[in-house]
């Protein structure tokens, strides 16, 4: 009996260790890469212009993790002035949830925060914004809302949402589990088949109709010609890393990645996010491409950061 108990205990410990492997990943950015390598994917963007004036609303909230993780205010302070360097773009900020006037003005809302418990009226405002033609880019924890019975309403606005700790999952990932992209989708057309990051994602999310998964974390494949459809069937795949969604006249582009602050200083990650922004707005991505290099290109033409950026004190506003 004792022997059986010991075997059972060892098996349980093995499962716990396996489940915890991702959480033991050491936070570390990718090495900077030459600018000419990135331009292969940005394409030429000199003198590229948007087709119209774009009003962006950046939704943020209090930072809720240790420094370097879920730095909602820090990332807002990085991206808002950067986006405003794009001709014909203006950016407004909203804390926790927009007013109706802000929704009325916005062409695109970018959300990076842990959402509060929204009221039915607020969900109606949000859904009407999307269905009426508004665009949304949802980053990382923005797909989570509590109490969890509100998750279906959130999914109606952005396509996917956290189902609760029993049904949805989270974990860190690194080089052994690349981010695979559906690079025949318009948002990612012409990009690499896979990108390596050292970050965190969620998977097994609640999905609405009209969701298309276009990015997934999976064990590294030796087959360079493996299709994205086959990646989604891989054992151990973490789908829902990136998705697109349409509801009414609106578009949403979502990701469960973007946990660490240094990830936003990675040129390939910026490129992916900016592609999503352009797709959601039905705009050519070229006018946004200078931001891939903005503030992270050194004198030798290397783009990125070597700073893990963990030495930071969280703020509430």
What do the PLM-derived regions correspond to, one by one?
Residues 116-191:
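A glycine-rich, often tryptophan-bearing local segment used as a flexible ligand/cofactor-contacting loop or short
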Residues 4-13:
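Sec-dependent N-terminal signal peptides
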Residues 16-19:
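Boundary at the C-terminal end of the N-terminal hydrophobic targeting segment
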Residues 48-53, 84, 101-105, 119-120, ...:
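Extracellular/periplasmic catalytic domains that process cell-envelope and extracellular macromolecules
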Residues 21-51, 223-317:
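Extracellular ligand-binding/catalytic regions of CAZymes and related secreted enzymes
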Residues 24-27, 68-146:
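Helical hinge/lid and interdomain linker segments adjacent to catalytic or ligand-binding clefts
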Residues 33-42, 169-248:
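Catalytic beta-strand/loop cores that center a nucleophilic Ser/Cys/Thr
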Residues 53-64:
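Short beta-strand segments enriched in small/hydrophobic residues
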